[in-house]
Amino acid sequence: AYAFLDQDAPDTANPSLWRDTQLNHIYGLFEVTDGIYQVRGYDMSNVTFIKGDTGWIVVDPLMSMECAAAAFSLVEENLGTFPVKAVIYSHSHVDHFGGVRGIISEEDVQSGDVQVIAPEGFEKHAVSENIYAGTAMGRRASYQYGTMLEASETGALAIGIGMGQSRGSTSYISPTLEITETGEKHTIDGVEIEFQLTPGTEAPAEMNFWIGSKNALWMAENCTGTLH
């Protein structure tokens, strides 16, 4: 569907958006650093897998269950089968939590086998934005992203942070641990993570985190290479 990208930008497309589309179309499993992996290009957002002592810490499980399940299958095929020990929602936009039930179940959480971690105020804003305003937002998105257009030199290209919104089933599981203070630290499956709350930034409820043992800083969508 995107073979037309194998050329320089035509006169019908903004060159920056054309290049952004070429880069977003590079998809698959990527090693970020030792023990941290991402599946990119499977949905509007990327999903991150952090290896703990016994299993995975999954960060932002995409928008739809089908995409999240496919991403997890790719990880297992290439990196082995390990249980999910925790899910972290970086912020309250649906493309960062909607696929959660494609990776874990409510039973996993209720049994205490899996933690679900989110910033303070996450559930309130996830509900207010995605339920109360969801229909209106969806209609506006069709104009913003050109979702009714075919992908072509004269049609739809990428949407800045990804190739587009997936059209599968969205889901939700409530957090079991809410981060309420910047500097708060938690050790999850042997990995110490320090959190920084960033409310009212790219989303009403959002947070960054730091993994000192990996020298890795996660900034969610507070830092993107687009005008998103």
Describe each region flagged by the PLM:
Residues 1-26:
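N-terminal pre-domain segments of enzymes
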Residues 22-82, 206-211, 215-222:
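Conserved beta-strand hairpin/beta-sheet module of binuclear metal-dependent hydrolase folds
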Residues 31, 55-56, 63-66, 117, 123-199, ...:
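Metallo-beta-lactamase
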Residues 36, 114, 193:
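Short, conserved active-site loop motifs that form the nucleotide-linked donor/cofactor pocket
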Residues 54-55, 65-117:
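Active-site metal-binding motif and surrounding structural segment of the metallo-beta-lactamase
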Residues 93-95, 122, 223:
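Catalytic metal-binding/acid-base residues of hydrolase active sites
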